[in-house]
Amino acid sequence: PDRLNGGVIGIASALGWHDSGQHVHQCHQLLFAQAGCMTIELGNQVYLLPPSRAAWLPAGVPHQVLMRGVVAYRSLYFTPQPELPASVQVVAVNPLLREIIERMALWPWNKPEAEQRLTLALFMEELAQAPQETWQLPLPTDARLGAWLQEIKRGNILPERLNRLAERVGASDKTIGRIFMKETGMNYQAWRQQWRLLRAMELLAEAVPISRIATALEFSSDSAFISFFKQHTGQTPLRYLNSRGESHQPS
């Protein structure tokens, strides 16, 4: 797809566990999951892409995509043009934009440009009007935390309490605290809570039952998890899903 002669090429595929590694494209890309959930790492920021969000990546932007469950993967590749966005965007996807993405992802690779124009114009209009999303997690870059971060990204461990993390990396609690405040703008406890929240959203998008999410994230009970989620989002998990058109999750 990096060698486009014009127009848009789409990819639609069902993918399981996948780590793309950091890479770049010579063309613009839109990433979207019709079902399931992806995370995308851009610089030292991690963004969540459930079915209610899409990421616009201009040509040349290094990124890494991780899928920990089954994802209905959609990717659109665009020939760089002045009228297309030149900066990274993570946007909310309404029902119309969702259907436009699906149509473009499924059309033939040899579809004539003239037959793409109306759909592409509607796509650009909807993308320009889509609200920006802000749920993200800044990552520390200190080398002492590198191996620990990789284990977390792979889902092998959860972010532990501060004293246990300090023991793991051979640093003091205060040193770890300073690293997180300097490199993420958050104290470690706030960072850990933000990580748990985004991981909960990811699991909800993958249709994991609330009881299993509560256990996986080491909450003392389902009600403790629901209270935590509501405290941070203002909504219960199921109300959050309903508000975003992701209400297929079991309770």
Identify the residue ranges that each predicted region occupies.
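Short acidic-glycine-tyrosine-enriched beta hairpin
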Residues: 44-59
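Generic protein-terminus/edge-of-domain signal
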Residues: 1-37
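Ligand-binding loop in jelly-roll beta-barrel domains
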Residues: 60-88
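Amphipathic alpha-helical segments enriched in hydrophobic/aromatic residues interleaved with Lys/Arg
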Residues: 83-153
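Terminal helix-turn-helix DNA-binding modules in bacterial transcription factors
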Residues: 163, 182-226, 242-251
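Alpha-helical residues within the helix-turn-helix
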Residues: 167, 178, 182, 215-216, ...
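Basic, amphipathic alpha-helical hairpins
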Residues: 104-112, 126-134, 148-161, 180, ...
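Short hydrophobic/aromatic patch on the recognition helix
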Residues: 52, 176, 180, 224-225, ...
